[in-house]
Structures are given as C-alpha cells and as structure tokens.
Amino acid sequence: MKIIARNKKALFDYSIIERFEAGIVLKGSEVVALRAGRANLKDSFVRIIKNEIFLLNSHISLLHTTHSFYKHEERGARKLLMHRKQIDKLLGKVSIEGYTIVALDLYFNTKNKVKATLALAKGKNLHDKRETLKKKQADLEAKAAMKNYK
C-alpha cells in the first residue's frame, strides 16, 4: 500500500468516528499525476449528491508532459465508489446526527488501484484542539526525556 496524499489537517480538526474505503473514478492523466505524487487533500471534502458520493476540491496537479487533449480539471469533482448500504449509512449519519465525511488519504492498493480512505467525523471545538496540542507536546517532552536517560 503506497500512500499518495494524506490530509493531516483532518486529524487535527475532526475526531474520527469510523473509517471507510472507497474507490475513485479517475481519468488516465489523473492516475499518471497520482503516480508522480502530485495530489493534495488539504481543503477537500466529501458530499453526497443524489445518492452518489463525490470528493470535492481535491487538487491533482497536471504533469508538464500531459497533452492538452487529455488534461483534467485540477480541482474537479471526483466520484467515489462505495456500496449502496455504506452510502445510505453515511447519508443517515450526516443528515440526522450532524456528522461530516472527511477524506483522510489517497493510496494505491496491492492491485495498483487508487483508493481513498474516508472517515465519518465530528468537528472538534477549540478546547479539544488545544487539548490535542497539549497531549502532543507532552508526548514529545516524554520522548526527549527518555532519550536523555538511555
């Protein structure tokens, strides 16, 4: 499993409830760009539109070798492939309980297919974010202290 892009900001801004794997519909030029590692999920989000699930605002850069006929839209909507039951479950959670769906990473699986890891998440408050930062800082200090005693 080769990870192409990771959304680090999502782990800071949201508390993850459940993770899902989804296939993604891409053009050939997009796959070539992903193999070169030219993807960014920083501002991306997932929406369910007419019982289909889409990854929006994800950035896949163009390669300089791509012919103008085959160029793709860099920030276009990309359809995600999931089972109907999974989509219905996500739709119920998002519409009723106030959760959101976040893209965590893009990767190539063992069969060289591009997959996306999605997460059902709930937004963190400012207090929760500060607590996360404090915990991270404490872990770093503990590691540094352990390193000195070796």
Curated annotation (Swiss-Prot):
Q: Which GO terms describe its biological process?
A: trans-translation
Enumerate the subcellular locations listed in this protein's record, separating them with semicolons.
Cytoplasm
Q: Which GO terms describe its cellular component?
A: cytosol
Is Glycosyltransferase one of the keywords UniProt gives this record? no
Keyword annotations for this protein, in alphabetical order, are: Cytoplasm, RNA-binding
Q: What's a Pfam family in this record? A: SmpB
Please indicate if the UniProt record lists RNA-binding as a keyword: yes
The family database entries (Gene3D superfamilies) matched by this protein are listed as: 2.40.280.10
- A Gene Ontology MF term for this entry? RNA binding
NCBIfam families in the record: PRK05422.1, smpB
Entry similarity comment: Belongs to the SmpB family.
> HAMAP family annotated for this entry?
SmpB
Q: What does this protein do?
A: Required for rescue of stalled ribosomes mediated by trans-translation. Binds to transfer-messenger RNA (tmRNA), required for stable association of tmRNA with ribosomes. tmRNA and SmpB together mimic tRNA shape, replacing the anticodon stem-loop with SmpB. tmRNA is encoded by the ssrA gene; the 2 termini fold to resemble tRNA(Ala) and it encodes a 'tag peptide', a short internal open reading frame. During trans-translation Ala-aminoacylated tmRNA acts like a tRNA, entering the A-site of stalled ribosomes, displacing the stalled mRNA.
Q: What is this protein called?
A: SsrA-binding protein
- Point out the gene that encodes the protein: smpB
